[in-house]
Amino acid sequence: IGQNRSDNPVRVSAAEEPVKIMALGDSITDGYFGTDGYRKYFYHNMTEMGHDIDMVGAKDYSGWNPSYTDSNGVTFEYDGDHSGYSGYAIQYMTGTETRQGLLETVQSTDMIKKCDPDIVLLQIGTNDILSNYNEGIIDRLENLVNVILEDMNDSDDVVFVSTIPYMDVLMVYDWFWSYGEVKSDNSQEDFAKIVHGYVDSYNDQIKQMVTEMQTQGKPVKFADINSVIDPSTDLQDGIHPNETGYQKMGTYWSNLVDDYLSTEPETTTEETTSADKYKKGDVNTDGEINVSDLIVLQKYLLKKGGILPEQ
């Protein structure tokens, strides 16, 4: 896991085995307010692009593929396996509000080692901000990502770490009771700006964290779900996406992963020295040492032929 890898080695759907992908996160990954959320669109899009993928997760549909009919009347099957947990924070938190932790669940289920994903799509942190657990939020996320990386079985696995969407604070104003005086001492509009500021700060820190981890040679990639969700039109209840929002997420994720899988890995061209080119005894320099070399040598000794000068 700690190796330097600037290329994209997991590649590809042309491989003999499908690419195993785990959607990991909170209720937005689980698909709250929408049948399996963005995951059904992601799977459908990826297969339409020609990729052979296997969705994996601690929540296993045991080989049964559900079906869904989209707004255009198109019915498709998808792989529903995932690791999305409604109400979860990055790690277990208790104080003003108790939240179960994704970190502890990853560890207790041993899901990464057991499911062996090639790619993890991680989006988590909305409930931390909702419950006013903003202090230390990026440290908790980095710890979670490192635990995932440590549990990954192959050196060419990768974790995509995503930003989180904005919340429509005014729609779910009462849900932010954990903010206490910060909430009561400000107008609703000003409080909404404060919460949006926490989201902005967290998302900026995610991008910076991914960049720093990449410089350390860790296989992480940045994803920006925040960029595709409009809180004024794409949310069902102020927190969770509606079907339009989930579809946008599925499109974003599938385009991002398709680009990753379809990009040719970087190759290193090594300089070849004369010592690499010619083997001792390979008189005719054909890369092999056999009777042909003996014939050339005999001709040389009989002055009926020659050999290449020394290199």
Show where each model-derived region lies.
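Histidine-centered active-site loop/cap adjacent to the catalytic His
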Residues: 21-24, 234-266
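Residues in Ca2+-coordinating acidic/glycine-rich loops
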Residues: 25, 243, 284-288
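Active-site-proximal beta-strand/loop segments in catalytic clefts of secreted hydrolases
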Residues: 24-28, 56-61, 122-127, 162-167, ...
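Substrate-gating cap/lid alpha-helix
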Residues: 168-223, 243-248
